[in-house]
Amino acid sequence: MGMVSKRKKMHYGDTHLQRRWRVRNRRRDLDQIDDDLQTRSGELINQNVDLDKPGFAQFYCVHCAKYFIDDTAMQAHFRTKVHKRRLKALEIEPYSIEEAERAAGRGSFVKPKKRAMETQPSKEDVVAGKRIRVEVVPEDTDATDSPSTSKTKRKKVEKMET
């Protein structure tokens, strides 16, 4: 006779994975950050002193929605891949209610606009009047208007020979 087998604890050591998905660790979504960029970016950079936040809420990255302890930490953050990836993600216009309705069949598809995004100016520049620039990048309309298939090229060549 063998011994009775004990129940195995499959997810016993996964507490570090569970912590990652807790609500207190949630970051702001891209559409919320885009709304902050459009409406109140200067206000977020020049916040009042708050003793509960890191760096007394004086060093805030608007694109990543994150506080830093001092200016050197924030400038080092601007050079990291995390910040650069967030800038690239913010270049595309965020998902909207209109886009959801078009996806449900209540309209025609409109390609999301691509924008030029820059890192936020320093605090002194904001006091001087500089703001975060978000510009829509114009796309090439030549490629979408005329199809470049081999049949259309052949037809043009045939017309030239006759």
Curated annotation (Swiss-Prot):
Residues 110-162 are annotated as: Disordered. The keyword Mitochondrion does not apply. Residues 115-136 have a biased composition (Basic and acidic residues). One of its GO terms (cellular component) is cytoplasm. This is Zinc finger protein 593 homolog. Residues 151-162 have a biased composition (Basic residues). Keywords: Cytoplasm, Metal-binding, Nucleus, Ribosome biogenesis, Zinc, Zinc-finger. Its main location: nucleus. InterPro entries: C2H2-ZF_Maturation_Protein, Matrin/U1-like-C_Znf_C2H2, Znf_C2H2_jaz, Znf_C2H2_sf, Znf_C2H2_type. A zinc finger (C2H2-type) spans 59-83. Involved in pre-60S ribosomal particles maturation by promoting the nuclear export of the 60S ribosome. SMART domains: ZnF_U1 (SM00451). Gene3D superfamilies: Classic Zinc Finger. Belongs to the ZNF593/BUD20 C2H2-type zinc-finger protein family. Associates with pre-60S ribosomal particles; released from the pre-60S particle very early in the cytoplasm. One of its GO terms (biological process) is ribosome biogenesis. The keyword Transcription does not apply. GO terms for molecular function: nucleic acid binding; zinc ion binding. It comes from the Eukaryota.
